Each structure stands twice: as C-alpha cells, then as structure tokens.
Curated annotation (Swiss-Prot):
Stated name of the protein: Adenosine deaminase domain-containing protein 1
Gene Ontology cellular component terms for the protein in this record: male germ cell nucleus
Gene3D superfamilies, A to Z: 3.30.160.20
UniProt family annotation: Belongs to the ADAD family.
Amino acid sequence: MATAGGSRRAPVPGPRLGLPLAAHLPASLGGEGAKDSVGGEKTSGNNDWFQSSRVPSFAQMLKKNLPVQPSAQTVTLPTGYSSESCSLSNMASKVTQVTGNFPEPLLSKGLSSISNPVLPPKKLPKEFIMKYKRGEINPVSALHQFAQMQRVQLDLKETVTTGNVMGPYFAFCAVVDGIQYKTGLGQNKKESRSNAAKLALDELLQLDEPEPRVLEPAGPPPIPAEPVVTPEAAYVSKVQYEGRQVQYAKISQLVKETFGQLISNHSQYLKCSSSLAAFIIERAGHHEVVAIGTGEYNYSQCIKPNGRVLHDTHAVVTARRSLLRYFYRQLLLFYSKNPAMMEKSIFCTEPASNLLTLKQNINLYLYMNQLPKGSAQIKSQLRLNPHSISAFEANEELSLHVAVEGKIYLTVYCSADGVNRVNSMSSSDKLTRWEVLGVQGALLSHFIQPVYISSILVGDGNCNDTRGLEIAINQRVDDALTSKLPMFYLVNRPHISLVPTAYPLQINLDHKSLSLNWAQGDNSLEIVDGLNGKITESSPFKSGLSMASRLCKAAMLSRFNLLAKEAKTDDLLEARTYHAAKCMSGPYQEAKALLKAYLQQHGYGSWIVKSPCIEQFSM
C-alpha cells in the first residue's frame, strides 16, 4: 500500500505465501540475518523476539466474526503488562479475558447481535449520587455508570450548536434509551462531551429541579434520537465548518512559518519537512506552535539500558516528546509561586483534585504533514463485506503494527513479552493510545490530569481522505471503555480534518534517517540520527560528549526529578529507577492495562512491550 510519503508498506509475510516467514523478516524480527548474541553490547535480555504464529484462514476469520453468546471468562491481565512488573490493586476486576487474533468490531457491527435477556434496572446507590454531586466522578464516566446500572443504551453523539451560537464551538448531546437530552457546548470535544453528560445526568437524577417532577398524562413525544436538522441548524453547521477550515488553514501556515524560521540557517534539512509533525496550543483564540518533530525511522539495534538512546524518531512521536519538554517548562512556571509566572502557565489547580489541569479555553492541536504509519494508511477502497477478500485485508490493516527499521509489520508475528532488540509500535497505534491515556505519559501523570488532542490536522499533499485515521483513532476503541477507566480518563474523539499542506512531500535520500526536534523555549534545533538514537555531529544543539538527545528517557527523568523538588512531592523522589517512577503512577498504569486488554480482547493483537531492562536506570 502506498504511504503518504510515497513509500510502500512493507509486505507482511505470511503462511499463505508458501515461503518460510523468517526468510522475509529483517534481522531484528528474527529473520535469517538474526544473531543469537548481541555483538559487543551489554544486554540483560536474550529472549527470542520472533515467535511462530499462524494467521487464521479466511473461513476461521469469518467464523470468528459471527455473533456468539458472551462468555463468563475469568478475568486476567494482558500478557505484556505483567512483564512491566507494575503492581496495581483491583485492576484485574476491570480487565476481561483476552481472545482472538484479529479485529472484529467493524465487521461484527454489520451482523445482527444476539440480544441479552431483559434484566431489571439496578437501584442507584446513594453513594454514587453523592460522589457525583461532590464532583468525585466526572460526568462522562458517571453517565456511563448510570447507563450500566439502569441497563439502558447510551450514545454521546456530536451535533450542531443551537440558536445563534457562532464560532469554533463543539456540540454534543447524550442519547439515553433513545431519548435525546440537552446539547452541551465546549471549546473542545472533551469539554462539550462533559457538559452534555452533566446536562443529561442532572435531568435524569432530577438534580436541577427543586421539587420532584409530576409526569403529565399526555404531552409531546420525546425528542427522537435522530432529530430532523432544520435549515437554520444546517446553516449554522455549514458556517461552523467553513470557520474551522479557515482556522485550520491558518494553523497549517503557522506551522510552515515556524519550521521555516528554525531551518533558515540550515537549508540542507528542508527536505526533512516531508514528515513534519507539530503540536499547537490555542489560548483564547490565539495559536502558537509549541513542539515540532520530523523523522521516519526507529532505533533497532541492541539494547543499551542507560536511557540515553532515542528508540523511536518518527515525526509524531518526536513531536510528542518535544511537547513533554514544553509541559515540564509550563509546570515549572506554575510551581515557581511567582504570580506573574503562574499566570503565563497553561496549567491551573482544579477543585476536588490534587492534579493540575489545562486552563479554560486552552486546546491542543496536532498537525501532521502526512498520515502516520500503520492503520491510519488503510486503503480507502477496502470494503468490509465479510464475503470478500477485502474483509481479510481490513483485518490486517486494522490490527496493531510494529515499526522495524522504518517499515511496518503486524504484531501477530512478534512476541509480546520483551525482546533483545528495540522495536516500537506504529505511530497510528500510539495515536490510538494517546486518545485514551492522554499525551502526557506516566511521569507527568503524577502532576496533571490527562491532556487530550482536540483536533488532528493532516496535510493534503499526498492524502485525499482521512478514513483510515478516523477508523484507527475514533472507531477501534468504543466509548463504553470510558466507564471502566480511572477518574479523569476517557475515550477521546478528536476532530480530524484535511488542511492545506505546510510543505510538499519530497524524496529525502540525503537525510533519510535524520530526525529534527524543537520545543518552545529552545534556542535551536536538535538533529538525531534515528538509526543509532544519538545526536549528529552537525546538530546545532549538542547536549555533551555523550551525544544523548534532549528527548531521551534519562533527560526526561532528570526533568521529572527537578519538577518533583519544585512541587515538593518528596515521595516521588524515592523512586530508584525510571521504571519505578512510571509504575508509581497508579491510575495511568491502570488505564494502560485496560486499554491493552481491550485491544487484545477485540482482536487487534498484542501491544509489544520493550524489554524492562531499558527502563532500569537511575540518575
């Protein structure tokens, strides 16, 4: 399949080709060039990464997608999670038994499901209502719990704003048991979904009425789940769409200008712009680029357990790690206790929580000059008819993928319990993960609530639709997972749109393996060789003799320790290693385990976990 960068997805070898699988895989996947020992490099992991796996036949795949009675399996944690040695209480009760190898949701949705026997609704516990009133349960999670207890169907659907509301507002409404409730508005999807859930719950629990309602014997029927869109609403929707597109085009131009300024004295790196990704912060309508990354490779050499090597230098991953550096700076502004500095920070306190959150009217955008590798590049002509070969192709396209030496392979060919070479999940899969866990990662989750992307903008230079990205991010994980997630976590649905490309796509043979990074506050670009994970000699910024990138794990741990001191959270400083500090973030690890179990249970495959020894270092 042709990728957005003009390259083709690496063919995934399988038994149906009639050739041994190992003959087609690179050395790091256990192919013919793989060696048993790590030449000249110390490593504590010698596990054989490749395991023999058979792809089920098309008939088996179809059989799997037929509706079956739900089974009451014993609850277990995902295999990959146990290898991380993170001990969390009560997590197992939220994770279901893992079954299957291929995704079925999109196929099975087209088939009739066997209805469950009608069960009476459960009585709402007073404790649940009181917790919701006190703000201890976020509205979206509370509404999902309400629907489960009352045994009714729930859908939080995007709609159009009502009345004469103009501007870049998002609108959602809750549909509970076929009845549509009031529309919630917000500057971003998270806020509007939360407001919609609150409006519905307040009415369902009668919290907005001083006296109990008296049901009238007759009256107008409930609002239908699929309301008729009036010409006025259609006009408002059109105005909003056009307004957003103008705004998005300005953001694309802003990204172009920012990157252009950074390489003004380094024009030899202009072709690196083909893979450009950037994060943009919106404050009260004003936009600023805060993090930039480029790159198309990942480190796939032998393990070096010192935390000073960059493992994944794909553009969106590099931009996200640059964003983390921006977050650390913003948090240091907040903890400075200087009122003027705190005012500049994007973070603030929130009642009933010891975690900081983004200030009101602050939104996060992601711009990508091309589609990320993996499921986002699904062929637009694929059809999900279970009687066609396209259904089999779709199962492969929608599964989790691993990036090896810049190419993409299905995780079904990989062992999920650690490897002696470093390989990373595809950028599409990481985006899927961030839309549940947030972009902040485990370390920053000690200080802030999850931060979600409001909108994803894709340059149209070599892309004419975002169907694959929509499926990878907005359809692989169901909204129902939100009710199982810890406080503040949810299944986010970013708005996805094609925009004018910031830079035309170019073939970059001279600097193919290079990755550029920058975060707001940096004086210059840093250039990393993605193949060895170190800074290049020609990089405008150099950290020291070790040539370790400012994005590496060791650098992040150093910033984490500094922030913990400023925030006076001495308990966090007791973590002996980088790995231990991550595992101390209980809610984040719980949410991660639930997501991994969900993906595996629904047939998308196993999330490949890097060897634990990579994180067993300290400063």
